[in-house]
């Protein structure tokens, strides 16, 4: 079975796909929003230029681009192996797990470079299988971190060590109806942290937000983006008739003020490989040499069990190989682009103004991307790509079910009610790759319709256009999303 999987991951299907264009005529929807003449670039099959793959399988996210050859291919495979390797708590090679952690490998949460089923729908809290496929971020209500816990509650621990806390999830449901009478349901999850390692934290002084893993689709292209183009999008991202006004999140990464691109709130300027190994798995490295529970009794308990915390768990070269692996992943091509239902759905996507934030076309800078060790990847440069994102942050509202998507968590300039526009490329294969259709930052949306109907704030007008479509038009828009 292992060899079959490897063959499937290496196999690529090449095809010639024609590009076509069609026009959406000017119209006015039921909310009075005027949709101007827009050229709908139907047929954007080559999602990532020369980094596009044509796989339609469970490994569609987990393949190198065609230009990954020679020593790059060797390093890609080494990085892939480290990404999927199950860490243990011993002192040997590929050990170093814990003492507390959230997942035991990158692949435990990002299965096949995608997103493992959220704990919200699997274990309804801290998992019993050594990982929970979620991160629990906490702060005081004044924004400060708790001394005993830092920014993340690690709900898993190695043998003999107590987790920092456990999470219980309860869900509230509410049924709504489209104007044509068709019902839809939204789920609002509520999180409770119990079994605290140290002093219990009063809910009155606690902000808690949960993140499920992101798909690792198009990471290299994101890092190669023309930053000036993104800043220009922010400068002109002002559509008062739609209530849309996106902006950049600037953060300090590696001591330099940079444009944030990665993460739910665009809170990172690189792929944060070392941070993931440290914060998620407790695996120390040259950037994060201290254990994540430094100062807690867990460190002493581990030492008493014969574990050593004096040497790093991961070498710099290993981190660089994982960084290269993530940069070199290819992006699945669009499928069924000539299907009439998909074409109609693409028209509905534009009619609803979805393209104003989920920007169809962007470009990478001439020099491509640069790895942690300074290695240049020029093959990522000068590419026309179709991520369906502006990589800007937008107010997503607080009004739905009394809470909306506001999690009160501030990241750089990004406020609690603001989120980065999620890149949609590859999203139509998530069911095939990961076996579920859970979307949004904590997986509360169980399908495309629920994800759309959770849009508030700057997404409210577009949501209302979708809401007032006919059932046929809504179904067509969903078919278009499945094609991405």
PLM-predicted stretches and their roles:
Residues 73, 112-115, 156-193, 312-334, ...:
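C-terminal capping alpha-helices of c-type cytochrome domains
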Residues 16-23:
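Bacterial N-terminal signal peptides
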Residues 6-15:
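Bacterial N-terminal signal peptides that target proteins for export
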Residues 101-113, 216, 322, 345, ...:
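The canonical Cys-X-X-Cys-His
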Residues 186, 197, 201, 208-209, ...:
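C-terminal accessory segments of proteins
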Residues 59-97, 321-350, 364, 369, ...:
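Electrostatic cytochrome c docking/interface patches
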Residues 54-55, 61-75, 85-319:
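Extracytoplasmic redox metalloprotein regions
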Residues 24-48:
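Bacterial Sec-dependent N-terminal signal peptides
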């Amino acid at each position: 079975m292992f060899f079959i999987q490897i063959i499937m991951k290496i196999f690529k299907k090449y095809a010639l796909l024609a590009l076509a264009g069609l026009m959406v005529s000017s119209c006015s929807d039921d909310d009075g929003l005027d949709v101007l003449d827009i050229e709908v670039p139907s047929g954007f099959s080559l999602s990532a230029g020369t980094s596009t793959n044509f796989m339609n399988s469970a490994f569609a996210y987990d393949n190198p681009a065609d230009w990954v050859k020679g020593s790059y291919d060797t390093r890609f495979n080494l990085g892939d192996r480290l990404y999927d390797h199950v860490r243990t708590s011993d002192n040997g090679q590929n050990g170093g797990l814990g003492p507390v952690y959230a997942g035991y490998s990158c692949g435990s949460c990002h299965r096949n470079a995608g997103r493992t089923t959220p704990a919200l729908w699997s274990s309804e809290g801290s998992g019993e299988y050594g990982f929970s496929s979620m991160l629990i971020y906490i702060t005081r209500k004044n924004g400060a971190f708790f001394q005993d816990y830092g920014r993340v509650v690690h709900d898993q621990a190695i043998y003999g060590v107590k987790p920092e806390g456990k999470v219980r999830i309860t869900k509230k449901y509410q049924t709504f109806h489209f104007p044509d009478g068709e019902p839809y349901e939204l789920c609002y999850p509520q999180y409770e942290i119990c079994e605290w390692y140290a002093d219990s934290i009063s809910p009155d002084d606690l902000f808690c937000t949960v993140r499920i893993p992101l798909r690792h689709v198009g990471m290299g292209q994101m890092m190669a983006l023309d930053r000036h183009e993104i800043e220009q999008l922010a400068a002109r991202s002002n559509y008062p008739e739609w209530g849309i006004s996106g902006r950049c999140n600037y953060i300090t990464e590696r001591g330099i003020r940079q444009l944030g691109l990665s993460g739910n709130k665009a809170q990172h300027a690189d792929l944060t490989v070392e941070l993931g190994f440290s914060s998620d798995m407790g695996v120390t490295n040259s950037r994060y040499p201290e254990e994540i529970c430094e100062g807690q009794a867990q460190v002493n308990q581990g030492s008493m069990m014969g574990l050593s915390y004096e040497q790093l768990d991961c070498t710099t070269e290993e981190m660089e190989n994982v960084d290269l692996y993530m940069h070199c992943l290819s992006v699945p091509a669009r499928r069924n682009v000539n299907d009439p239902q998909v074409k109609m759905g693409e028209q509905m996507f534009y009619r609803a103004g979805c393209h104003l934030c989920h920007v169809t076309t962007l470009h990478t800078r001439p020099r491509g991307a640069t790895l942690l060790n300074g290695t240049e990847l020029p093959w990522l440069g000068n590419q026309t790509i179709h991520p369906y994102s502006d990589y800007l942050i937008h107010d997503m509202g607080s009004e739905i079910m009394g809470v909306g998507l506001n999690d009160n968590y501030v990241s750089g300039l990004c406020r609690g009610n603001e989120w980065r526009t999620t890149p949609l490329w590859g999203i139509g294969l998530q069911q095939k790759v990961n076996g579920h259709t859970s979307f949004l930052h904590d997986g509360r949306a169980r399908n495309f319709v629920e994800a759309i109907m959770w849009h508030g704030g700057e997404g409210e007008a577009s949501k209302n256009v979708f809401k007032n479509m006919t059932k046929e038009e809504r179904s067509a828009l969903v078919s278009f999303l499945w094609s991405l």
